[in-house]
Regions:
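NAD(P)H-binding glycine-rich loop region in Rossmannoid oxidoreductase-like domains
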Residues: 32-37, 41, 45-97
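Catalytic helix-loop patch of NAD(P)-dependent Rossmann-fold dehydrogenases
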Residues: 120-159
């Protein structure tokens, strides 16, 4: 099976590494950083340096592929123009070149649950209205729409709305390293949704095996409040306690509890259904 992974950062590289162990897969990996070519050649048969605005390079990537995994993220900036260039422009250019690549039967995109916006801690599922809290969230909604519109009888499009990503090399203590011993605004009762790297890799594998299409949330079973999560981390690793200042309220743009029932109903079994403290 010929598979291309567009965007080999933390997630894309892990998917490539997993598939590289399976002789059934011929992997094409892309990077925007030429210096990473030799590293990626250890987990892919072919490496192409390509940016999302380079239609010629994308056309070379998708030719003769059976499946595409789109796993991209801005390198350094959270500015809206960086998000637009990384996500929306890449999606539009990819859809354009896929029209000339009939061999591609499936496109899998690793998106974000941030498209739901602030639901004040309410539960949401894949049918819930999308109310992104900022311009970056709106760009992610538009990116989903562009990709979903490309689906047809020949091409299945599967979108994973990922929780916050953690795992080997991206441990929770590293993610929150600046929080310990500090005072954070609010009460800490806002909810966050997480997903382990192992489950992202396994879910992508699952999606290819079952030829999934449509939208699926990919998050752990039970969302945790920020206070609970940081308290648990502080206790386990003997780190300074995080304090909260209710007088300094801060709007949390992604305060929702995200359901993972749909992917479970499809037959996926989580490796880490609970957050690994």
């Amino acid at each position: 099976m010929n598979v291309a992974i567009i965007g080999c950062g933390y997630v894309g590289t892990a998917v490539a590494r997993h598939w590289h162990r399976d002789r059934r897969y011929q992997i094409t990996a892309t990077t925007t950083t030429p210096e990473r070519t030799s590293e990626l050649e250890q987990v892919a048969q072919r490496v192409i340096v390509a940016k999302g605005d380079d239609e010629t390079a994308l056309k070379a990537v998708v030719q003769n592929q059976d499946a595409i995994v789109l796993s991209i993220a801005p390198k350094f900036s959270l500015a809206a123009n960086s998000y637009e260039a990384t996500y929306l422009h890449t999606a539009k250019n990819l859809v354009k070149v896929l029209q000339q690549a009939p061999s591609v039967k499936q496109l899998i995109y690793t998106g974000s649950y941030s498209v739901y916006g602030n639901k004040n801690g309410a539960w949401v599922d894949e049918e819930s209205p999308l109310t992104p809290a900022n311009q970056n969230g709106e760009i992610l909604v538009q990116t989903e729409q562009v990709l979903l519109a490309a689906a047809n009888e020949n091409l299945k499009v599967c979108i994973f709305r990922l929780g916050g990503i953690y795992g080997s090399g991206r441990e929770l203590t590293k993610i929150f390293s600046r929080a310990f011993g500090s005072t954070r605004p609010g009460t800490g009762e806002d909810f966050s949704n997480w997903i382990h790297l192992d489950d992202i890799v396994a879910a992508v594998d699952f999606a290819v095996a079952l030829q999934l299409q449509g939208i699926y949330n990919l998050v752990i079973d039970e969302p945790r409040s920020s206070r609970d999560l940081l308290d648990r981390l502080s206790q386990k690793y003997s780190l300074p306690t995080v304090m909260w200042d209710p007088s300094a309220q801060e709007v949390r743009p992604y305060n929702a509890r995200v359901s993972n029932q749909k992917i479970k109903a499809a037959g996926y079994s989580f490796i880490h259904p609970q957050i690994m403290i």
